[in-house]
Amino acid sequence: MTEKVIKTDAEWRAMLDDEEYDVTRHAATEAPFSGRYWDHHEHGIYTCVCCNTPLFASDAKFDSGCGWPSYFTALNPDNVKEKIDRAYGMIRTEVICNVCDAHLGHVFNDGPPPTGLRYCINSASLRFDATPDLNES
């Protein structure tokens, strides 16, 4: 596994915009249908906004209709971790970057095949790295 990224609160505040900071460091949730990647269709890799760890591939992205980017699998399961989230009187499974502990979103058991999972991820927790389409001439 990649070495843990640990920063002070002041360092996180200096490198992230307000929404990125609130989402990743304080588990806030951006409004649905508002994030830059909920309706994004380019080919590439979505990385952690805090530490650049590769998290999700565009090939695993699907339109769940929920207003947040949704993926049926993580790019590398070792790069994300899950924990029980009991906030707001609900029991959900929170998804966190395993390298820097950034809050990413939640995972639900209502996704498509082949996994049946829906990683519902805040755009504010992600950066996108485009990769060339190998099928193009």
Curated annotation (Swiss-Prot):
Organism name: Herminiimonas arsenicoxydans
EC number: 1.8.4.12
Name of the protein: Peptide methionine sulfoxide reductase MsrB
Transmembrane regions: none
UniProt binding sites for Zn(2+): C48, C51, C97, C100
NCBIfam families, A to Z: peptide-methionine (R)-S-oxide reductase MsrB (TIGR00357)
Any one GO MF annotation of this record: zinc ion binding
Catalytic activity, reaction form: L-methionyl-[protein] + [thioredoxin]-disulfide + H2O = L-methionyl-(R)-S-oxide-[protein] + [thioredoxin]-dithiol
Cofactor-binding details, from the entry: Binds 1 zinc ion per subunit. The zinc ion is important for the structural integrity of the protein.
Keyword Repeat: no
BP terms from Gene Ontology: protein repair; response to oxidative stress
Annotated active site: C120 (nucleophile)
Xref: SUPFAM superfamilies: Mss4-like
Residue span(s) of domain MsrB: 9-131
Keyword annotations of the record: Metal-binding, Oxidoreductase, Zinc
Family: Belongs to the MsrB Met sulfoxide reductase family.
Cofactor: Zn(2+)
Enzyme class: oxidoreductase
Keyword Oxidoreductase set for record: yes
Domain of life: Bacteria
UniProt GO cellular component terms: cytoplasm
